[in-house]
Amino acid sequence: MKKAAPKFSVEEVLRATGGEVISKSSTVKRFCGISTDSRAVAPGNLFVALKGENFDGHDFVREVLEKEAAGVLIQDEEKVVPFLTRENTAIIRVAD
């Protein structure tokens, strides 16, 4: 039996990260699971765009949104400008 993904509200994520919603038309209230791996994103997930030595998660935002991620947690707003007006997507910017 597969374990259900934890659910988090947008408000819980904002409190935990100190982030702010920067998307213009988001109606998302909850996320069903969190992923840092774009290959494993499922519909309803919050994708955390980590920047590492070899990869920058910001480069995979389009891919995870095509997989129906409900939101993305980002640092670099410039890399997600094309998605700021996307409906039903919460884009949350954090300092670090």
Which residues fall in each region the model found?
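N-terminal leader/targeting and accessory segments in enzymes
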Residues: 1-96
